[in-house]
Amino acid sequence: MLQNIRIVLVETSHTGNMGSVARAMKTMGLTNLWLVNPLVKPDSQAIALAAGASDVIGNAQIVDTLDEALAGCSLVVGTSARSRTLPWPMLDPRECGLKSVAEAANTPVALVFGRERVGLTNDELQKCHYHVAIAANPEYSSLNLAMAVQVIAYEVRMAWLATQENGDAADHEEMPYPLVDDLERFYGHLEQTLLSTGFIRENHPGQVMNKLRRLFTRARPESQELNILRGILASIEQQNKGK
C-alpha cells in the first residue's frame, strides 16, 4: 500500500534537500520518490544526506512535467503555506494521511511539494484535489522541504499502522474515482465545449475554468458520474454541429 504513495518534488534546486527528503521518507516506510524538472540532478551530496536511504534516491523517477508525475493517480494533495485568492478544499496533515492511505489501497496517490523558496504555482495547485497546510508556529513558520515531507510522511505512517492494527487493509472495495488523467481530459473537453458555445472567449476566459475546477474538485465525481458529464458535453457538441 505504501508503495502506492508518491512523494513528488517540483523543481528542487538543492541536491541536499533530495537526500534529506529521501531519509525522511524511508524512516516512515515510503520509497516512491518523483522529481519533476529538478534544477539539479541527484549527486554525492544527495547520497550523503540520504544517510542510508540512497536506494530511494537511486530509484527516483525523474520527469519533465507535473502531469507526468501525476499520471495514473486518483488522488493528488498539494502542500500550500499561503492563503490563495481562489480557496480550495483543505486538509490538515492528519486528514491527509488518512485520505492518502485509504485511497492508496487501490490506486496511486501523489503528495506534491513545491520549490524551496516559492512552493507550488497556482496552476500546479489547481491540479490537486486538496491542499494540505502544516499548522506551524505563526511567528516562525519556516519549515524546510525535508521537514514538511517528514510531517506528512509521519501522518501517512500513523494512518497506515492503524489499518494494520484494525485489519482494514485486507479487504477494500475498488475506489470509484477517476484518475487524474481522466479528469484532465474532462477539463479539456469542458473548456472546448464552453469555447464552442461562446460561453467563454479564448482570449478572455476569466476565472470560469478555475472556478469550475474548484467546483468539480469539491464535488469529486465518481468515474460513472464523470462519464455522464462527458456524454452531456458530447451531446452539446453534436447539437452545435447540427446548427
UniProtKB/Swiss-Prot annotation:
It is an enzyme of class 2 (transferase). InterPro entries: Alpha/beta_knot_MTases (IPR029028), RNA_MeTrfase_TrmJ/LasT (IPR004384), SpoU_MeTrfase (IPR001537), tRNA_m1G_MTases_N (IPR029026). GO terms for molecular function: RNA binding; tRNA (cytidine(32)/uridine(32)-2'-O)-methyltransferase activity. One of its GO terms (biological process) is tRNA nucleoside ribose methylation. The keyword Repeat does not apply. S-adenosyl-L-methionine binds at T79, S80, A81, G114, I134, S141, S142, L143. CDD domains: SpoU-like_TrmJ. It is found in: Cytoplasm. The keyword Cytoplasm applies. It catalyses: cytidine(32) in tRNA + S-adenosyl-L-methionine = 2'-O-methylcytidine(32) in tRNA + S-adenosyl-L-homocysteine + H(+); uridine(32) in tRNA + S-adenosyl-L-methionine = 2'-O-methyluridine(32) in tRNA + S-adenosyl-L-homocysteine + H(+). Its EC number is 2.1.1.200. One of its GO terms (cellular component) is cytosol. Keywords: Cytoplasm, Methyltransferase, S-adenosyl-L-methionine, Transferase, tRNA processing. It comes from the Bacteria. Homodimer. Catalyzes the formation of 2'O-methylated cytidine (Cm32) or 2'O-methylated uridine (Um32) at position 32 in tRNA. Belongs to the class IV-like SAM-binding methyltransferase superfamily. RNA methyltransferase TrmH family. This is tRNA (cytidine/uridine-2'-O-)-methyltransferase TrmJ. The lineage of its organism: Bacteria, Pseudomonadati, Pseudomonadota, Gammaproteobacteria, Enterobacterales. The gene is trmJ.
